[in-house]
From Swiss-Prot:
Identification of the protein by name: Anhydro-N-acetylmuramic acid kinase
High-level lineage: Bacteria, Pseudomonadati, Pseudomonadota, Betaproteobacteria, Burkholderiales
Family to which this protein belongs: Belongs to the anhydro-N-acetylmuramic acid kinase family.
Catalytic reaction list: 1,6-anhydro-N-acetyl-beta-muramate + ATP + H2O = N-acetyl-D-muramate 6-phosphate + ADP + H(+)
Disulfide bonds, paired cysteine numbers: none
Organism: Burkholderia thailandensis (strain ATCC 700388 / DSM 13276 / CCUG 48851 / CIP 106301 / E264)
Any one GO BP annotation for this protein: peptidoglycan turnover
Length: 384
């Protein structure tokens, strides 16, 4: 980071991921030469009506523009509620905050066609919070020929790199992604050309969808549904027979590909399987697709640190550890809490950091990760 930059100060970060269950927020102070200091955090859930609208926007249909605009307004209201809760908890006012970095809600991600769409009414959010809002982080990377994802590797390198060992940070959100952090013997540097990362495949997107269908619950709490089942190796092979898994990095994906329709098409020849066996197999799919990418790109990895909602699923973490060992990797699996950052904080903290980088007019992407033509300042400002 730059020395003594005037961008230092208090920032908010908001992230609502592909699970679409709510928004995670964080209040953090960034000061040059010091680790980020978390001042408060909050989670604000989405009502079923908003969640249904967001799911619907991921499918082609009539009147999408109207539905998107209304959903963006509803998101801004929930985001603002999260900000107000965090400010109260931290004892701060809007005037104390330099900026709010907000990811928005991804409803389309098609970088191969030159666009990615995260909905959010950032102007309304600035009005409701009276805080400078920095949003639309992915578009500039896509405009520069990149995937627009993942964007967190630069932050991961800053926070989690080691001078002594190669580490992998694995985000198990709706989609899984990895950041490969080679031993940084010259010190941590988010611009290190050796940092790599990409999306691996589905994680909670399919696991949650199957739990909702068969348990009427939004997720498989503690992985207990999967634990009741047995992995069907034939189905697992069919699920892994997807061109995306063979695609070379840089690459990114989302619910555009890995959704309930994709799963149903794969299940067409497996009608007799018990629901819990399918859930066990979906859990194994996530573990296998992540382990395959780590074995392919980070064979010298010595530790894997997990963040995202999947970090709360011990069955999934055990499956990942088993899959890594089966591929000859001696890499224990832990959550980022072992490195001092609770796993539920990592992504919202990353978007607060990206807002900080924007104010410093410093790059937020790693072009070697996304495939962009170069490093770019990411985001757009909506003044308070």
């Amino acid at each position: 980071m730059q020395t003594g930059h005037p961008a230092d100060g208090v920032y908010l970060g908001l992230m609502s991921g592909t699970s679409m269950d709510g928004v995670d927020g964080i209040t953090v102070r960034f000061e040059t030469g010091k680790p980020p200091a978390v001042l408060s955090e909050a989670f604000v859930g989405f009502a079923d009506t908003l969640r249904d609208s967001l799911f619907a926007l991921q499918q082609p249909g009539d009147d999408e523009i109207e539905r998107e605009a209304l959903a963006a307004n509803a998101l801004a209201a929930r985001y603002a509620a999260c900000c107000h809760e965090m400010l109260r908890a931290a004892g701060l006012s809007p005037d104390d905050v330099r900026a709010l970095g907000v990811h928005g809600q991804t409803v389309r991600h098609r970088p191969e066609r030159g666009y990615t769409r995260q909905i959010n009414n950032a102007a309304l959010l600035a009005e409701l919070t009276r805080i400078d809002v920095i949003a639309d982080f992915r578009s500039r990377d896509v405009a520069a020929g990149g995937q627009g994802a993942p964007l967190v590797p630069a932050f991961h390198a800053t926070m989690f790199g080691s001078p002594d060992e190669t580490r992998v940070v694995c985000n198990l959100g709706g989609i899984s992604n990895i950041t490969i952090l080679p031993a940084a013997r010259d010190g941590r540097d988010e611009r290190n050309d050796a940092v790599r990362g990409h999306d691996c495949g589905p994680a909670n997107a399919l696991i949650d969808a199957w739990a909702l269908r068969h348990l009427k619950r939004p997720f498989d709490e503690g992985g207990r549904f999967a634990a009741r089942g047995t992995v069907d190796e034939t189905l697992l092979a069919a699920l892994l027979d997807e061109p995306y898994f063979r695609q070379s990095a840089p690459k990114s994906t989302g619910r555009d590909l890995f959704n309930a329709d994709w799963l149903d098409a794969k299940l067409a020849g497996f009608r007799g399987l018990a629901p819990e066996d399918v859930q066990a197999t979906l859990t194994a799919l996530t573990a296998a697709s992540v382990a395959d990418e780590i074995a392919r790109h980070a064979h010298d990895c010595r530790a894997v640190y997990v963040c995202g909602g999947g970090a709360r699923n011990p069955v999934l973490l055990d499956a990942l550890a088993t899959a890594l060992a089966a591929r000859g990797l001696d890499a224990p699996v832990a959550t980022t809490a072992a490195l001092g950052v609770p796993p539920q904080q990592v992504e919202s903290l990353a978007f607060a950091w990206l807002a900080y980088r924007f104010n410093a007019r410093a790059p937020g992407n790693v072009s070697a990760v996304t495939g962009a033509a170069g490093e770019r300042v990411l985001g757009a400002l909506y003044p308070r």
